[in-house]
């Protein structure tokens, strides 16, 4: 603290501003950031200069293909159910099937486009070519690191690695760094100030790295960024937003900023962060999935998003004036959870920037962007509860005046993601109910494994066709991702080779299937809690590998295990074939406690890593910046 107060900084360059605690900040350069209206507004520049050729055809393929495949599958399902008429429950089943099949089909269509982009080299845009020499910069960019009660040692280790990497590019003079704290607890504030002072001493970065802690953290992260824009944004043409666990190479940062400089009508460029640093089985499984499946998904959505891409809230560069002019978020009318400050602000900010006439792009092929994932399923679900509320809150924003229809689609997809969970649950419950009210169903029948057993006069062939096609659509993105990896020798070897990658995909699919019912149940509960008016609150995120005690596991998942046993028993009583078809869901629920315990264990993750399972290139051949982050964190550990 004393070192911070005694920093010798030229008064013409830096002044100390009291927010709370001790702040070290540059002279203020205010930039107006008016609050935007959701009732008034119009779409500026309906078609962007940087939009890909044929973007309309790409979107027609996605929507038309989704609708066509969904209608065909629904028609076949209707034909299966039609003989003898359809009762109310069967009608509900058909409607649920139609919507859920359309949901997975859209993901398949997008992944298929991503596969061809990856294999045949499409999708590069904005003049960003990682193989070309590093361009020279001519503007100033602020790297913003918002933090809320995070471990400052971990946080500033990442910041130091980015700083050093940018210094190696020879263009550090174009960047300044801001640690923007919203921490409320005094012990976190004091630790942040102490670590910040030590960082500046180590790097000799006085006058280039700044720190402040807000006295009033209104608006959470969005309010934190908005406060910086209004006070300091006028001095910087771009800002690069980082999360507390974000790391980026200097090369990647420079290329993103250069793309912004050379495309004056672009307001936002989102990179694809690679998930790294996982040690538990769950974290390593998640980062493997993000490594193998993530690119094909990202290439696909970038292909049809065009100049209307989304924003994930971090690891993205934003034109400061575009953000200030158009992304001032209003408070939503009404009480929480639907009213108040916008929680999932990133989607809305991207939509408003696009409404203001600026293009928003994603560049999934640019490597060197990293983040960390939650260590356990429990930590993911805690975070997911907040995302659930934020996405459902978009129901008040999706009809805002002047938004591009793709921006509205982003919000509807986010809302739909959470409503699919209770829809899957309803599909399961309706499946149990149909044999109960069916005419002539023999509940004592033997183990006849065909679902056609539930309806008289239905053929096994039609039902098998529906089942096979549904499973193909569900699993095809993973298969396409595997085939795409086979075309990339370096990545294939870095992931352990073709055989180990295939084994990893199989194990990941099994674990994901076991955890899917847990996620379905808790996401459904989250939806109902939001609809009932329960707010998610704002807690610090768990980033280190936290151990879960058996008492916590039983308290969190014991009820779900009992529910799974009861549903399985009921399904078997109704019809043994039904119980057999429902067994993946029932087993996942019934064994939720041991599944979460197993996947939360670091030892299991370490063993699988030694066996070459769930390997990613960032483990077998980490970049220099990741090696540096690990060194700095080890050095700062007590």
UniProtKB/Swiss-Prot annotation:
What InterPro entries does the database record attribute to this sequence? Glucans_biosynth_gluTrFase_H, Glyco_trans_2-like, Glycosyltr_2/OpgH_subfam, Nucleotide-diphossugar_trans
The UniProt entry's GO biological process terms, in alphabetical order, are: glucan biosynthetic process
- The EC number(s) given in the record are 2.4.1.-
Q: Does the keyword Methyltransferase apply?
A: no
- List GO terms (cellular component aspect): plasma membrane
Q: Mind listing the UniProt keywords for this protein, alphabetically?
A: Cell inner membrane, Cell membrane, Glycosyltransferase, Membrane, Transferase, Transmembrane, Transmembrane helix
Q: Cellular location of this protein?
A: Cell inner membrane
What GO molecular functions are on record for this protein?
Answer: hexosyltransferase activity
Instruction: Kindly tell me the pathway this chain contributes to.
Output: Glycan metabolism; osmoregulated periplasmic glucan (OPG) biosynthesis
Quick one: where is this thing mainly located?
membrane
Q: Name one Pfam family in it.
A: Glyco_trans_2_3
Q: Which domain of life is it from?
A: Bacteria
Give the transmembrane region(s): 57-79, 94-116, 415-437, 464-486, 499-521, 578-600
Question: What role does it play?
Answer: Involved in the biosynthesis of osmoregulated periplasmic glucans (OPGs).
Q: Which PANTHER family match?
A: CELLULOSE SYNTHASE CATALYTIC SUBUNIT A [UDP-FORMING], GLUCANS BIOSYNTHESIS GLUCOSYLTRANSFERASE H
Q: Which family does it belong to?
A: Belongs to the glycosyltransferase 2 family. OpgH subfamily.
Question: This chain belongs to which protein, by name?
Answer: Glucans biosynthesis glucosyltransferase H
Read off the lineage from the record. Bacteria, Pseudomonadati, Pseudomonadota, Gammaproteobacteria, Lysobacterales
Q: Which gene encodes it?
A: opgH
